[in-house]
A protein has these predicted regions:
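Claisen-condensing/thiolase-fold acyl-transfer catalytic domains that form or cleave C-C bonds
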Residues: 1-105
Length: 105
């Protein structure tokens, strides 16, 4: 998720339809979005943790997904078979969503 601000992950999870509106904050507080939770989200810690290289954020997200799907990520999500990268740019005027899968996982 493109979480350049703390609230962004919560908004994104709800806007993308993963969690019902008004419930994403409680999911995060309960650990349900942790790497071992019901809906692992940003196991690297997201943009706030690893940095926000404007213009290269999407490449970083895809790299992280590839490592997850290959089973080589330091914060590996157990049984990762599919991943979603969500990125924003240009003050919210550009949005991309990429879905990657490892059929051999």
């Amino acid at each position: 998720m493109h979480d350049c601000f703390s609230i962004a992950e919560i908004i994104d999870l709800e806007d993308l339809g993963f969690i019902n509106p008004g419930h994403a904050a409680s999911w995060a507080e309960e650990g349900r979005t942790d790497s071992n939770g019901d809906l692992p989200t940003n196991p690297s810690g997201g943009l706030i943790s690893k940095g926000h290289p404007v213009g290269a954020t999407g490449v970083g997200q895809i790299f992280e997904l590839c490592k997850q799907l290959r089973g080589t990520h330091p914060n590996q999500v157990r049984g990762a078979k599919i991943g979603l990268a969500h990125n924003l740019g240009g003050c919210g005027v550009t949005c991309s969503v990429s879905i990657l899968a490892n059929p051999n996982a």
